[in-house]
Every structure is written in C-alpha cells, then in structure tokens.
Regions:
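N-terminal membrane-anchoring/stem segments of glycan-assembly enzymes
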Residues: 1-142, 448-449, 471, 481
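Short, acidic, metal-binding catalytic loop of nucleotide-sugar glycosyltransferases
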Residues: 164-173
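Cell-envelope/extracellular polymer assembly enzymes that use nucleotide-activated donors
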Residues: 144-147, 175, 313, 328
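Membrane-embedded multi-pass helical conduit in multi-pass membrane proteins
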Residues: 57-64, 80, 90-114, 396-485
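Long helical/loop segments within the catalytic core of UDP-sugar-dependent glycosyltransferases
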Residues: 126, 210, 215-217, 221-223, ...
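Acidic helix N-cap motif at the loop->helix transition within catalytic regions
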Residues: 160-161, 185-194, 218, 242
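A conserved acidic beta->alpha catalytic loop
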Residues: 172, 180-189, 211
Length: 493
C-alpha cells in the first residue's frame, strides 16, 4: 500500500516537472523567435537569462501534494525569486547596453522587455497546469454548516438579485445573514421581503445597525454566524448555483483557512467596462493561479470569499485601519499560517461605467492595497515564520504593484524624447512586440476562461496603450497619497 502510493507520488512529481519544463521551454522559444525576427535579437540575451533562471527555479523546487504545492525551504528563498525577476534583467540590460552603446531610451526599452517576458515564464506554466492538469477537488462526505453574510449599504437596486441567487444556490441547511449598515434607501425593506422564504434549509436573519462601514457590518454578522464556514458576498454580486458547494469542497483540507471566489463583469456595455472585464479575466487565469498553487492567494475578494470562522476569530476579525479590509484580513490569515486557495466558480458583479466612478473605485482600492502592504511590511523581516508568504506571496505582490507603473511612465517619457529627437522609428519594433505579446496573453486568458466572448480581444491593445496608463496613473497617485498621508477626502476631490 505504502509502496504503491509512494510510486504514484513520484510519477506525479515527474509529470508535473515535465509539464512545467515543456510549457516554459515552449514560451522561451516563442519569445526568442519574436525578438529575433523583430530585429532586436541582441535583447534575446537579456530575455533568456532571467527566463532560464525562473524556469530552473520552478523545475527544481516543485512538489505536488494534496492538490497544492509544497517547497523545499532550503532551496526556495526570496533572493532566488528576486534574482530571476529583477536583478538578472537589470544586470543583463546594463551589460548589453554598455557593449552595444545603446541610447538611454533603448536601455529602458531593453530592460522593460525582459521584465515583461519574465512574468510570462514565471506565471504561465503554473497557470496552464492549474487549469488543465490539476485534479479537481472531490466533494467531502461531511457537509459542514455554512453561513452566508451579506453586508449592505444603500443597495436597493441590487440586493434582491443577490439574495435570490444565494437562496437558490445548491447547498443544504445554509444560514443567510443580511447586515443593513445604516442604509438610507429601501435596502432594509427589500431584505425583509425575503424573510418569508426562510425555511429549515434557508435560515434567514436580518440585522440593522448604524452606519459604520463594511468591516463593522461583517464583524457584527460573524457574531450571529452559526456556520463552521462563513462565505461573505457583496450585496451587488450574483453567484452561480453551484458556487457555495464548490467553495466548501476546498475546506476539507484542514490547513485551508480561506478560499477566494472568481469574479466576472456583469454589465459590459462600453469600452471601459469591457477593458475591465478583460483585465479581470487575465488576472484570474494568468496571475492568480500560481498564488493558489502556492497556497498564498493574496486577496480574497469581497464579491465572494469563504473563510473558516475560527480562523477569522483567532486573528481579531476585520479591521478598519485600511481602505481594503478584504486584503487586510487575507494578509492576517496568511500570517497566522494555513493556505488560501482560489476556486473556479463565479460571482457576477457590476463595474463602473464612467471614468469618474472608475477613478473613485480604483483610488480607494489602490490606496488600501498600499496601506495594507505597508501595514504588513514586517513579513519581509521574518525568515521562516511566514513561509511562502515571506518567500513568494508578499515580495511578488509588492514588486508587481509598485515597479510596473513607474516603468511604464518612464518608457513613455523616453519614447516622447525619442520622437522629439527624430529617432522615434527605433521604438516601432518594441511597440509591435508588446502589442503582439498583449494579444497573445489575452487570447490565452480568454481561451482558459472557456465560455467567454472573443470580442474582448478587440480591447486588448488598450492594455498596452490607454487603459493601462489610466490604471498606472491612479496607482502612482495612490502611492504618493499614502506616503504624504493625504486624507481620503482630499484624494477624492
């Protein structure tokens, strides 16, 4: 019995390494060909070196166990990750640019290209494995008690649809708690209509309180929660019928403390909302999967997230010290140990349709994200206590949040200088490569999504020029607002 299980584990490990190696090698060859035929073959060296480092890192450290990844902590260290993602591209770029006497804007371009390509090698193989090769988690024999908490403030237009989707969700004996956070519209009246549908299978509870914010509403709901597992759903989200049962499956593993749901855009009606939809799809399929396999999904979204109730209680509930309480509670749970995974079931939510509303939403998100990263900066000073959070989750999240926006603004500045100096044609090939890369990534993400509208591909170029710059501007502003300690009201003006 033991010998057979051991042999099976070895075979699974070999299969995993082979998949990662072949996926990485395919991407490596593809990018090398793109760079070569783009008449920028010299940059291939700067691209290949960090890519090889990343591939080697993945191959030599991966072990598959219990549907997730565990790593040899003697091999896997933060410096190795930073070497592959940051240090090696910088060194490669400096050496190559010095040898071939590149102009300053060419140096920036040659640095930015490897940085972009490395992210593909680091994320894409794991994303492909998680999507197509990872075995599905089986439904546990014992169905745990479940509580769904819906914090609501002035949600008269959305709450009814949300509650209907929860009540109709396929899960036995669930408790539904609606917390009206001092709404001034008909939110409470709408919530009360669904109380008559309360039954032995759907125990329904409405709590009314003075306005205190989402964190206080959730904390109050937790006081009345009877479920071993608590799922928190925003009042403007609509969940799939199988979402609750799919989410609970992951909690059969005792070390899983939370599960992040998938979000899809419901109101795709203009350019902005379609760009947001594509951004969400790419983030879910290409970026989140590696974090899930490592057990360190860094954000359990408010649209739909599941938690082991005792884990939240142990970490002191939700905190109002940042603007993104969802990110903060996720970090607190990760610091306390255990895994946080991502799931494939979906909740649908509406996104802003105007630039003004989009700015208001994102400035709050990004300010809150940076506040949370600073609040938990002690993770970087601890070598062993926080495990994969210290070695992978936090440094990668911090790096990808801060560095890309400034790099993007820098490349735009140098491009303007090049155009004004009459050498703008030298930027044509890098721009074409970036555009092709964006289209390639978008098509992969849409294909991995499955039932998705391929018309979103038409919005892919805006991920390079347009939508991307709007997001980067808001991120940069949010960083400086936090560092300068500007109040949120000042930011919102």
């Amino acid at each position: 019995m033991y010998k057979g299980s051991h042999t099976k584990m070895i075979n699974q490990r070999k299969q995993l390494k082979t998949i990662i190696f072949l996926s990485s090698l395919t991407g490596l060859i593809l990018v090398a060909l793109i760079v070569f035929f783009g008449f920028s073959y010299i940059l291939a060296t700067a691209t290949l070196v960090p890519a090889i480092v990343s591939c080697t890192f993945l191959i030599t450290t991966s072990k598959k166990q219990n549907g997730g990844f565990l790593y040899n902590t003697n091999i896997l260290t933060g410096p190795i990750i930073l070497l592959g993602l940051l240090v090696t591209p910088i060194i490669s770029t400096i050496i190559i640019s010095t040898i071939f006497s590149f102009a300053i804007y060419s140096i920036v371009v040659s640095f930015l290209m490897p940085m972009t390509f490395v992210s593909i090698f680091f994320y894409l193989p794991l994303s492909i494995y998680e999507k197509y090769f990872k075995k599905n988690t089986t439904i546990p024999l014992i169905i745990p008690t479940l509580t769904v908490i819906v914090p609501a403030y002035n949600e008269e237009n959305n709450l009814g649809k949300t509650l209907r989707s929860i009540i109709e969700a396929d899960y036995p004996n669930k408790q539904i708690i609606v917390v009206d956070d001092g709404s001034t519209d008909k939110t409470y009246a709408i919530a009360s209509k669904y109380k008559i549908k309360s039954s032995s299978k759907n125990r329904y509870c409405i709590i009314r309180k003075r306005n205190g914010g989402k964190a206080s509403a959730i904390n109050l709901g937790l006081r009345f929660a009877i479920g071993e597992i608590v799922i928190i759903i925003d009042a403007d989200s609509i969940i799939e019928r199988s979402a609750l049962k799919e989410m609970v499956k992951f909690f059969q593993y005792s070390d899983v403390v939370a599960v992040a749901g998938r979000v899809k855009v419901l109101n795709r009606s203009n350019i902005l909302s379609n760009c947001t939809a594509l951004e969400v799809i790419m983030g879910a399929n290409l970026l989140r999967s590696p974090f899930s396999l490592f057990g360190v999904v860094m954000m359990v979204p408010g649209a739909m997230g599941g938690f082991r109730k005792k884990s939240i209680l142990q970490r002191g509930l939700y905190d109002k010290s940042t603007l993104t309480e969802d990110f903060d509670i996720t970090m607190k749970l990760l610091k306390n140990g255990g895994r946080i995974l991502g799931m494939s079931s979906i909740s649908f939510t509406e996104v802003p349709l105007t630039l003004r509303d989009f700015y208001k939403q994102r400035i709050r998100w990004y300010r809150g994200n940076f506040q949370t990263l600073l609040k938990h900066k002690d993770i970087t000073r601890t070598n062993r206590k926080y495990g994969m959070l210290h070695k992978f989750g936090y440094p990668i999240t911090l790096f990808t949040f801060i560095i890309p926006p400034f790099l993007d603004m820098a490349i735009i500045g140098f491009a303007v200088i090049a155009i004004l100096g009459g050498t703008g044609m030298s930027l044509v090939v890098p721009f074409v490569l970036f555009m092709f890369l964006q289209l390639l990534l978008s098509s992969i993400a849409i294909m991995m999504e499955g039932k998705e509208d391929w018309k979103l591909m038409f919005y892919s170029p805006l991920g390079i020029l347009g939508y991307k710059q709007i997001i980067n501007f808001i991120i940069i502003k949010s960083i400086f607002d936090v560092l300068l300690r500007k109040s949120f009201r000042v930011t919102m003006r």
